[in-house]
């Protein structure tokens, strides 16, 4: 079983407009509301793929109830209730652009943070892999993911971390290391303080930096150009075919789902990397974020090339 953690979930509200007009009224006909947050995208894709998955995180208020009520019944909902209201994130789709308005979310008390920590320990009993995705809510210290990873490691669970900024830096500088991290080039550049490109030799060099010591898998997203990955001392380049993209939103989360599934099923390197990329591509072919059409899985799987470099 796989446990997905979304500490700062949201209701995602999508407003499609032909044109966004400032300082006046914009009327929207087709409004879409869905449970949002990177970890919730992960759990929905895992569910589509047929994995047994349970979802946790911190939720509160009517928005929190909306999230629970709008997840598929086959996902085991194990959220921790807090006093604050779960946030709303607005996406305005206009003239080929995407403008996002993101609420910060609720402020958690020390008691709520401690409560979730105990809740997390309890949920580990029957899981093999834990995914930790997205931003931390207000009130949680930057090293909170580091704390959860330490607990998971003590219980023999594999962990996949997908976050950025101070939370990621705290993990990299801490003692407890995740099994997998999945930065993109922009996040990698931010971590290293220099611009990174798709140059394989340069990527090889930086991924051997002591900053990443102790992390089994480093999987760097190259967008439409696939993935560059390091597993222990072996490096891989993953070539993916060109596809017609409907929406790339959530594709990174879908890739995390594939990584988690590969770990849970003890798959070899090539199978894990291929599955992860297929699920990311399948999400990009869908209008709905965090959804994959498995009818196209086998065809894409055969078109991906994983090369040791």
From Swiss-Prot:
Stated family: Belongs to the carbohydrate kinase PfkB family. LacC subfamily.
Protein name: Tagatose-6-phosphate kinase
PANTHER family in UniProt: 1-PHOSPHOFRUCTOKINASE, 1-PHOSPHOFRUCTOKINASE-RELATED
NCBIfam families per record: 1-PFK, lacC, PRK13508.1
Pfam families: PfkB
Keywords of the record: ATP-binding, Kinase, Lactose metabolism, Nucleotide-binding, Transferase
EC number, UniProt record: 2.7.1.144
Gene Ontology CC: one annotated term: cytosol
Biological classification of the source: Bacteria, Bacillati, Bacillota, Bacilli, Lactobacillales
Enzyme category, top tier: transferase
Organism per entry: Streptococcus pyogenes serotype M5 (strain Manfredo)
GO-annotated molecular function: ATP binding; phosphofructokinase activity; tagatose-6-phosphate kinase activity
Keyword Coiled coil carried by entry: no
Example of a GO biological process term: lactose catabolic process via tagatose-6-phosphate
Catalytic activity: D-tagatofuranose 6-phosphate + ATP = D-tagatofuranose 1,6-bisphosphate + ADP + H(+)
Pathway: Carbohydrate metabolism; D-tagatose 6-phosphate degradation; D-glyceraldehyde 3-phosphate and glycerone phosphate from D-tagatose 6-phosphate: step 1/2
């Amino acid at each position: 079983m796989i446990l997905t953690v979304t500490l700062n979930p949201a209701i995602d509200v999508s407003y499609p407009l032909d044109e966004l007009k400032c300082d006046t009224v914009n009327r929207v006909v087709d409004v879409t509301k869905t449970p949002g947050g990177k970890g919730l995208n992960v759990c929905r894709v895992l569910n589509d793929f047929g994995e047994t998955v349970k979802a946790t995180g911190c939720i509160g208020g009517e928005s929190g109830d909306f999230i629970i009520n709008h997840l598929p019944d086959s996902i085991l909902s194990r959220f921790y209730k807090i006093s604050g209201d779960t946030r709303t994130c607005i996406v305005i789709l206009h003239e080929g652009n995407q403008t996002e308005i993101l609420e910060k979310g609720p402020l958690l008390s020390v008691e709520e943070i401690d409560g979730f920590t105990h809740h997390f320990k309890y949920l580990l009993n029957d899981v093999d892999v834990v995914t930790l995705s997205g931003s931390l809510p207000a009130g949680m210290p930057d090293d909170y993911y580091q704390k959860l990873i330490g607990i998971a490691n003590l219980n023999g669970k594999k962990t996949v971390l997908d976050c950025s900024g101070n939370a990621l830096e705290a993990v990299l500088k801490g003692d407890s290391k995740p099994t997998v991290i999945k930065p993109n080039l922009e996040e990698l550049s931010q971590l290293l303080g220099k611009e990174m490109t798709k140059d394989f030799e340069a990527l090889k060099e930086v991924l051997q930096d002591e900053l990443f010591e102790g992390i089994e898998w480093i999987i760097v997203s190259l967008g439409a150009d696939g993935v560059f990955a390091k597993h222990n001392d072996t490096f891989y380049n993953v070539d993916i075919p060109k596809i017609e993209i409907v929406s790339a939103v959530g594709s990174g989360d879908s890739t995390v789902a594939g990584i988690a599934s590969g770990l849970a099923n003890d798959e070899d390197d090539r199978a894990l990397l291929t599955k992860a990329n297929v699920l990311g591509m399948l999400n990009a072919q869908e209008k709905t974020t965090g959804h994959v059409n498995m009818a196209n899985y086998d065809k894409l799987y055969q078109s991906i090339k994983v090369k040791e470099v």
